Amino acid sequence: MSARMKFICDTERCIDCNGCVTACKNENETPWGVNRRRVVTINDGVPGEQSISVACMHCTDAPCLAVCPTNCIYHTADGIVLHNKDQCIGCGYCSYACPFGAPQFPETGLFAHRGKMDKCTFCAGGPEPDTSEAEFKKYGRNRIAEGKLPACAEQCATKALLAGDAAQIGEIYRERVDTRGYGAELWGWEIAYNRGKK
């Protein structure tokens, strides 16, 4: 893989405006009930609340990819995790495996009767020819092929949501944290990895 395309959400900058969610829905014309991106607020209404924009994180070692029985989920050369709707059987294994809740299904009810899985594509389309009508209908707009950032990150007014090569956006985030003058770890890191203050 040449680049490792990732998202980072800077919780110190996210203001819970949901602009990223709206940009994604508008850009990709996703069906009602399918939300490729959402904003989650922890301790809502309490001083010190934190909001974070969540979607597929395009994991290097993606658990959804590991459990898919039809191999419809795959990595691109840039490290983006995409899926092939023609191979999806709607089993829902990816939904159970993903810690971010990224895989979405268009209908309610039992798995295998909920339709084809949908998720964030990092605005990179799918296996159909780049920028084709077939690609847009199944996966949304392929902004990466157009040389653009994902719509959610490009729209973010506070630049809380960063998208791009992991090394580059990681450096931007490190510079921000150094400027703030406290820990270099992402919010929630100490809880997730049991590194609380002693």
Q: What is the predicted role of each segment?
A:
Residues 1-198:
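Non-ligating segments of multi-cofactor redox enzymes
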